[in-house]
Amino acid sequence: MLNTLIVGASGYAGAELVSYVNRHPHMTITALTVSAQSNDAGKLISDLHPQLKGIVDLPLQPMSDVRDFSADVDVVFLATAHEVSHDLAPQFLQAGCVVFDLSGAFRVNDRAFYEKYYGFTHQYPELLEQAVYGLAEWNVDKLNTANLIAVPGCYPTAAQLSLKPLIDGGLLDLTQWPVINATSGVSGAGRKAAISNSFCEVSLQPYGVFTHRHQPEIAVHLGAEVIFTPHLGNFPRGILETITCRLKAGVTHAQVADVLQKAYGDKPLVRLYDKGVPALKNVVGLPFCDIGFAVQGEHLIVVATEDNLLKGAAAQAVQCANIRFGFAETQSLI
């Protein structure tokens, strides 16, 4: 059994991790922690997230010193803010743990990226070099031996799963940048209260136009520029992305379908649509990314859906852990 610590367990993604790890036959939860200053310290996880009542009734322990929790721990999931993960990950690695970080702290190997988009100076360039980007379907070989896994962002997961096989397959005319219009539920903004996320305020609105940190994350890992516009929708969870691309002259519907099938035909957590395009309701609460597309002449529209808290966060983290330790990829997920 892998002794597993979940840091930042009080949040939405943290609670999903608790659920997955609790039912994993090869993992056991050693502790659930929050920051020492958290108002949730000392509360039961099941009081904050009642869906866990009678299933996981562990307390949220305040953590001020990593050494109090790292002994005999094999796996650490960090469901923490970017700056917090930046500080904690090196300490857990030093203690011999394998770290799965759900924040953006180690996703891009460029210190200037963090100053520009995250507002802090990255102190661990050697870990940026070592970190493996956890886009699970595409990085299996590297994940097998990784000790620091940077779980991709929610928007970048759906965008890259949609575009990577098309770009790598040489089907797109990249002189016209792919345009990604993405809408996420309010849970993507986290559990902390904010006026902009309150019931009476939330509507349907773009945000972070030309400035969102997920745009460079997508572009860096695709090796191609994109235009990315996120939107906040008036629903709790899930992401739908509509991606408009130009195909190279002569590329057919059948070629697009073939490239996607070759990429994901044996990938259990990506579901391809033979006809039509996916709806959000079919992935909420599930660990899948659903992908469908339509072609008209040289124009291609790809639609991808996922649960932002699952395939966009907790489920992909556990999927990466399954790959890292040689378990079935879908263990505890489906």
From Swiss-Prot:
Q: Which SUPFAM superfamilies match?
A: Glyceraldehyde-3-phosphate dehydrogenase-like, C-terminal domain, NAD(P)-binding Rossmann-fold domains
Which PROSITE patterns has this protein been placed in?
ARGC
Identify the EC number(s). 1.2.1.38
Any idea which residues are catalytic in this one? 154
Keywords assigned by UniProt, alphabetized: Amino-acid biosynthesis, Arginine biosynthesis, Cytoplasm, NADP, Oxidoreductase
Give the catalytic activity: N-acetyl-L-glutamate 5-semialdehyde + phosphate + NADP(+) = N-acetyl-L-glutamyl 5-phosphate + NADPH + H(+)
**Claim: Transcription regulation is one of the keywords in the record:** no
| Any one annotated GO CC term | cytoplasm
Question: Which GO molecular function annotation, any one, does this entry have?
Answer: NAD binding
As for subcellular location, the record says:
Cytoplasm
Q: In which pathway does it act?
A: Amino-acid biosynthesis; L-arginine biosynthesis; N(2)-acetyl-L-ornithine from L-glutamate: step 3/4
Q: Which GO terms describe its biological process?
A: L-arginine biosynthetic process
Among PANTHER family, the record links this protein to: N-ACETYL-GAMMA-GLUTAMYL-PHOSPHATE REDUCTASE, CHLOROPLASTIC-RELATED, N-ACETYL-GAMMA-GLUTAMYL-PHOSPHATE REDUCTASE, CHLOROPLASTIC-RELATED-RELATED
Q: Which HAMAP family match?
A: ArgC_type1
The record's similarity note reads: Belongs to the NAGSA dehydrogenase family. Type 1 subfamily.
Q: What does this protein do?
A: Catalyzes the NADPH-dependent reduction of N-acetyl-5-glutamyl phosphate to yield N-acetyl-L-glutamate 5-semialdehyde.
Name recorded for this polypeptide: N-acetyl-gamma-glutamyl-phosphate reductase
- Which organism was this protein described from? Salmonella typhimurium (strain LT2 / SGSC1412 / ATCC 700720)
Instruction: Name the gene for this chain.
Output: argC
